[in-house]
């Protein structure tokens, strides 16, 4: 009997395999010659799809993920669509392993060109644990987690996570529920407590909150609608905290609605070589309760272009504005901050803009832009291996952060944002840590320094996910 084995379809190129030039040609074992003609040169029909190893997973969940397999018309399409179905099944987060077997049909109703596709799956245990480390914006943390995957059989999961970092400690409980047949449409609820230390402001903040959010795609964009209610406790981190920080101390209750839209065509989020990113976020607080009221808008734009000699030119632009609603001024916990190795390099962490006695208070409006040139290391050491994780980095950054008088009008706002621009330039080395984070070691030359700014003239180290 002629049999086609496809137990691991990862090496299969999406444009169809070239059986004459790839190592995975031995995946096809055909006998006798008549069957070979049927499989290779004629249309085929997928008559049945079987699953082996299913336990608590519901049939309607997997039926949506494998529906395209039945539409395949030839052997190449069967293998490709089976590969795509395997990736979709793994993305659900309910299986530890998925293997595929493609075989000719047997039985009285078997067609001469009929195929059976069998998915051999291994479900995750009902309770799993994890231990790992994470890199944030110039901060590292240890993360312990417990997860209940596939809680009700339709890819739901409940997660408890504890994180201990250099500046922040948090724990939270979350529930995640995707829409059957459309994993990008999902709903989640989170309960959390976060305690953070912000030495640049001599501030300690503890947040206890609950949030609910819905994620969904529209055309080429992804959207998030979120409600968040949080009880915030602000306190002084040191006895030397300024009077402005002491005034901010106390308790506030924030209830806000937010919307985020993302368009992302980059090939990867860490050191992309091509593509663009546009992210726009709006937040409205006060209309659903709480004692904090404001409207907050911010955006992020990034463009990447691959050049000759494996070089990449990248440009980015950030901006935002916070408008208090009512008589109360904005809270230090809601304002924007700028400066540091992940934004305007050459300045200390969040040490640009309004300050009081050395404590930085943040601002209600900001912009920041950057231009970067990434090139391979000189002489390409370790090419094709570990050396490809490193890039040479040349950069030019600029930005400004300030408070606005909202009675002056837009022209006055733009004029103030264009005054006293901080900027810097330099060069360094970038290390990509997979698709998790990146590390930078740069030599920075800060320019446009204003009174009260804290600079980092010379070597500066940065670690994180989001960089200007």
UniProtKB/Swiss-Prot annotation:
GO biological process, one term: cristae formation
The keyword Membrane is annotated on this UniProt entry: yes
Gene that specifies this protein: samm50
Cellular component annotations (GO), alphabetically ordered: mitochondrial outer membrane
Subunit record text: Associates with the mitochondrial contact site and cristae organizing system (MICOS) complex (also known as MINOS or MitOS complex).
Keyword ATP-binding found: no
Native species: Xenopus tropicalis (Western clawed frog)
Keywords per UniProt: Membrane, Mitochondrion, Mitochondrion outer membrane, Transmembrane, Transmembrane beta strand
Lineage, broadest ranks: Eukaryota, Metazoa, Chordata, Craniata, Vertebrata
PROSITE patterns: POTRA (PS51779)
Protein name (Swiss-Prot/TrEMBL): Sorting and assembly machinery component 50 homolog
